[in-house]
């Protein structure tokens, strides 16, 4: 074969290679106030997530479920803090797994599990981003900012702390040191509608970008999301999306222990996922806080699976592009 033929053959192989996705269950429930999140990964599997992504043209590998490292029992001066040793074990394990997955596939997906899982998943993918010499960005779709530290949490439920941890805030003694903290100004939150005073102060202090539900009511989801995606694109950054079930209105997604009225609608959520797909910027994904014990015949698991499929390329409606 001549040189031109070899180049064309190589290009043809690359064009026909499937994008790779690895799925990892993170059956974490030690950070939540109610039991049940440990069943989340299997509920997503039962809802057909792997099959849907395969049908969309992805080469999907399910790695099973992660397990936490075994840690000594830990106490903290804040007596409200619960299950600190479990948080350390899960963070250490998931961070290493996330790093390995980000090195070996195009788009890792982490199935929760309560949102404390993101202390590990985000810190792991951020380490890979640093290896590549790029900037890590995070889109946090949630009713809560999750910006407490071990010292400020009043409930002691550690699913309220991951953003403060992975952005390198102080107050996490005993947790694994961060190899690559995420710049808090690279974190964009949408759907926020329940914030404690200490978290409100920290948002202003560190520069996290917040589009709460009032902003979404007044501007819609398009303007704030487009502005954020433009920032990511301009620096060729890598984008981690973390979707908490309570981002959605509990009327359509009841399977979460932290319901807050007034969440995102089905249409708003699908539009966000379609915009993310169109951007081509997403490099990793969390699906967090699914509690099947609180679900209605798998309704929420199916909805989140449907949203994930939109992010991976399935559309609610096929759109015709018109040239003007």
Swiss-Prot record:
Protein name: Arginase
List of residues binding Mn(2+) 2: 142, 144, 244, 246
Gene Ontology molecular function: any one: manganese ion binding
Pfam families: Arginase
Similarity annotation: Belongs to the arginase family.
Organism: Agrobacterium fabrum (strain C58 / ATCC 33970) (Agrobacterium tumefaciens (strain C58))
Catalysed transformations (reactions): L-arginine + H2O = urea + L-ornithine
Binding locations of substrate: 144-148, 155-157, 196, 258, 289
Pathway recorded for this protein: Nitrogen metabolism; urea cycle; L-ornithine and urea from L-arginine: step 1/1
Alphabetized UniProt keyword annotations: Arginine metabolism, Hydrolase, Manganese, Metal-binding, Plasmid
The keyword NAD belongs to this UniProt entry's keyword annotation: no
Any one Gene Ontology cellular component term annotated for this protein: cytoplasm
Quaternary structure note: Homohexamer.
Manner of cofactor binding, per the entry note: Binds 2 manganese ions per subunit.
EC number: 3.5.3.1
Cofactor (UniProt): Mn(2+)
Gene3D superfamilies referenced in this protein's UniProt entry, alphabetically: Ureohydrolase domain
Binding site for Mn(2+) 1: 115, 142, 146, 244
Presence of keyword Manganese: yes
GO biological-process terms attached to the record: arginine catabolic process to ornithine; urea cycle
Database matches in InterPro entries: Arginase (IPR014033), Ureohydrolase (IPR006035), Ureohydrolase_dom_sf (IPR023696), Ureohydrolase_Mn_BS (IPR020855)
Induction comment from the UniProt entry of this chain: By nopaline. But not by L-arginine or L-ornithine.
